[in-house]
């Protein structure tokens, strides 16, 4: 039985929550996020808190309620504080630059890689080998970071490639003669 769903999500001041059936809209200083929840979940909004529970007739009600609570908690954090994800480029000649909503990457290919950012996501490059992604939607930030990393994943011998800032790349020993 899920214990995650038993804890309510506290809605801070300045955050507007609208519950319309299974569609939840959360609006704050960083934007507006909308999510449609599973039919097995019942959401109640009262006293600046969201409470979750299962609907009758659904076997996986508590599991889905725990998932819904985690997703809506991330939405509340996103519209109040926002999320950041840092990437590092490791390798000779690997560079990054941001122009508007396009991230330009030089990753050792014969052509530069241009990645267009989705709406609601901003990027900045404090140095030529760092990318900082910011936004309100945790899932979209993670997906953009994974897409950028997929252009040149860290290889296991020298560790060259695009990696998350907190990622530890295990390197292999070179073949012995």
Swiss-Prot record:
Subunit structure: Part of the 50S ribosomal subunit.
GO CC aspect terms: cytosolic large ribosomal subunit
Species this chain originates from: Klebsiella pneumoniae (strain 342)
Keyword tRNA-binding carried by entry: no
InterPro entries according to UniProt: Ribosomal_uL6-like, Ribosomal_uL6-like_a/b-dom_sf, Ribosomal_uL6_a/b-dom, Ribosomal_uL6_bac-type, Ribosomal_uL6_CS
Protein task: This protein binds to the 23S rRNA, and is important in its secondary structure. It is located near the subunit interface in the base of the L7/L12 stalk, and near the tRNA binding site of the peptidyltransferase center.
GO MF term set: rRNA binding; structural constituent of ribosome
GO biological process: cytoplasmic translation
Alphabetized UniProt keyword annotations: Ribonucleoprotein, Ribosomal protein, RNA-binding, rRNA-binding
HAMAP family named among the record's database cross-references: Ribosomal_uL6_B
Protein name: Large ribosomal subunit protein uL6
PANTHER family: 60S/50S RIBOSOMAL PROTEIN L6/L9 (PTHR11655), LARGE RIBOSOMAL SUBUNIT PROTEIN UL6M (PTHR11655:SF14)
Superkingdom, taxonomy of origin: Bacteria
Family: Belongs to the universal ribosomal protein uL6 family.
Keyword Lipoprotein: no
